[in-house]
């Protein structure tokens, strides 16, 4: 649906799960995810591995990647948290975004590429760890603040790699909307970002 909701991955996971159940293949959820990923990367979609996380359903799951290795950990919030997913009624090109961000690997050729590596490396690792702790504590205020921080770093480091897609005017209008501020703790873009969807902590 081109909104950053992993919709193509959801179809791939559903297909893998259907084959698993119909033919009693005895695959784990991780096995279904791997089949779905291998199937999807043969298409123009070229999704990342995170998209197959939809296989876990409505549970909060931390996914850590190291090359082709994937580690998962279920996170149990201390209390309910409320998220709002917003269709920005604009457009994004995930394939182009990922193509441009991937130019930063394996070697950074300039300052923009170094910034992307900084963002997706140490900055991301620190914010994700803090977000995990906020989720476990059920701390919506802290989680919202971390989303805002993550978005600011994304704007600083990733947007220059693909400004046509990552300037995201519709997303930033929502995040800066004065009438919305009393009702949310913070928010950010979804997935590879762009003007597909936004996510807010209410």
Model-predicted regions and their roles:
Residues 1-15, 183-199:
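Glycine/serine-rich anion-binding loops at beta->alpha junctions
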